[in-house]
């Protein structure tokens, strides 16, 4: 458990400081300028399944941007990923694949139920290799990636625009923006016996409704046609938070599309059989396995 701010940093908290970063893993290969054997090994080790998975992960929680360094010539590319510290299995794997430095961000001032996070940021030829490798599998951020890679000098003929679906991609997006629910609920009824039942569903959210509709159509084409009614969350009744230094104005927020796959335990289990092998975050994988186990138990003859 993270200790209080005074226990962690008794003499180093600056006025107005809300967070502190701690390096917990240091890269041994930060300054590659040209192609070399270490990069070739990383490229070979970054297999197609991993590339598809991180296409989904970056579409959800990842970021990539170009910038102009103040003391160096030419445009530079920066790729970043930040995940909650206890849901960070994808980030840890990525750090191993590309030998990245991992930072841990802790909140010095308690802020609701906000948890510490882990993050990686990498630039240069590593970032270019990574983005070019996942480019064919990006969906939501493909247009942005096209512009960035063209800026970085990638030949346009290698940047194919068609979109493709895979369960590896969906696993990455699920670990980023998905909910896998398997919970026991107790129902209290007036003058009637209380009963309990399991609540289970699979859900994705995105500010890009077209992206979710592409995923939905792809799953329907594969036979998973047990979606619930699409939802859209709006924020016109959310009040703006004052006194903070980041954008919390609900008037600027895009509506959030919600895609939920329901159905029977058997239907969800059939879907999870395809998806679960590629999931990395432990609690989401466990909820899928619990659903499949429950379905097996209730169907024992």
List the predicted regions and their residue ranges.
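Internal intein/HINT superfamily modules and their associated LAGLIDADG
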Residues: 1-301
């Amino acid at each position: 458990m993270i200790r209080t701010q005074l226990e962690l940093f008794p003499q180093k908290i600056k006025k107005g400081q809300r967070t502190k970063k701690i390096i917990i893993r240091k890269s041994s290969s930060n300054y590659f300028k040209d192609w070399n054997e270490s990069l070739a090994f990383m490229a070979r080790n970054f297999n197609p399944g991993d590339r598809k998975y991180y296409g989904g992960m970056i579409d959800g929680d990842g970021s990539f941007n170009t910038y102009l360094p103040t003391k160096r010539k030419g445009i530079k590319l920066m790729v970043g990923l930040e995940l909650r510290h206890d849901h960070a299995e994808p980030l840890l794997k990525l750090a191993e694949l590309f030998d990245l430095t991992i930072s841990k961000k802790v909140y010095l001032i308690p802020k609701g139920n906000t948890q510490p996070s882990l993050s990686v940021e990498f630039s240069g030829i590593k970032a270019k290799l990574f983005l070019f490798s996942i480019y064919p599998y990006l969906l939501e951020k493909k247009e942005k990636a096209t512009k960035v890679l063209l800026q970085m000098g990638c030949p346009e003929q290698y940047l194919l625009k068609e979109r493709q679906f895979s369960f590896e991609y969906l696993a990455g997006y699920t670990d980023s923006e998905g909910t896998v629910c398997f919970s026991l609920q107790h129902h209290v009824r007036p003058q009637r016996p209380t009963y309990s039942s399991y609540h289970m569903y699979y859900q994705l959210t995105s500010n890009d409704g077209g992206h979710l509709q592409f995923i939905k159509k792809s799953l329907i084409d594969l036979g998973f046609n047990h979606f619930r009614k699409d939802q859209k969350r709006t924020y016109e009744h959310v009040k703006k938070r004052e006194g903070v230094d980041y954008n919390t104005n609900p008037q600027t927020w895009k509506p959030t599309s919600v895609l939920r796959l329901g159905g029977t335990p058997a239907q969800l289990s059939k879907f999870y059989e395809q998806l679960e092998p590629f999931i990395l975050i432990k609690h989401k994988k466990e909820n899928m396995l619990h659903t499949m186990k429950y379905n097996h138990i209730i169907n024992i003859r």
